[in-house]
Amino acid sequence: MVCTEKALMDFGIATQVVAALEEAGLTVLVYDKCVADAPSRICDEGVVFARENKVDGIVAVGGGSTIDTGKAIDLVLSMGGTTIADYYHVAEPEHKVKIIAIPTT
């Protein structure tokens, strides 16, 4: 799953990443709801999207907030929870979903 902002899809930045992943033979889904200083709801919606689509990897394309959103989605998926709020006080979570970050800032 590519985790990004709608604007980066519109500008063609994230679409280049999607195209490269598809060219490599991967099936790519896009979650483009990331925003600056995202509320926990954005992460939780990403978790639902990823879980419904059986996502096994995340590529976060964007700035710090987008990368943080991707990492938060990874955390909830890996730990088996339903919301990021469940993990505010977890010191060392176990990560089962693979994540790659591509900073654009």
Language-model segments: what does each one mean?
Residues 1-57:
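ATP/NTP phosphate-donor binding region
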Residues 41-105:
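Glycine/threonine-rich beta-strand-loop-alpha-helix active-site module
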